[in-house]
Amino acid sequence: IQKKLVDIKYFIYGSNKYLEKHGMPKTLVDLNKHKFISFGKGAPSPVYNPDWALKLGVKDGKKRKSIMKVNSVMGLLLAVEAGVGLAALPEYLVSNSNNVIKVLPNSEGPITEAHFVYPQSLKNTARITAFRNFLFSKIGDWKS
């Protein structure tokens, strides 16, 4: 059984500290003047194209260079919060951060669907029902 939980949206984010120092990009071309943090080659990614922000607004299929590569979404967030540069992050991850600002909010990245999947044989068990309710309550908290 598969139940869709949520669409996870990705945007480009930077810290207050970084954006005060380097300025807020106003156009896609402005991104070329900024430092980017990205996924390292071969690192497992939650999206099909983890480097989409490096290619956003760049012509001829080229991409910007990243100044730092990490192997997890949390690593990206920590580097952004530390003021290292800009990075593409899932919206839910930054929802509780007071230090991170969405850059170019109309430039949305890929959308990833998150699903709750379990075997048919566990459909009516208390354990699955409790966990499903927990997941939907947490998603409700994040969306509000």
Task: List each language-model region with its residue ranges.
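A bilobed periplasmic-binding-protein/Venus flytrap-type ligand-binding module shared by bacterial periplasmic
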Residues: 114-124
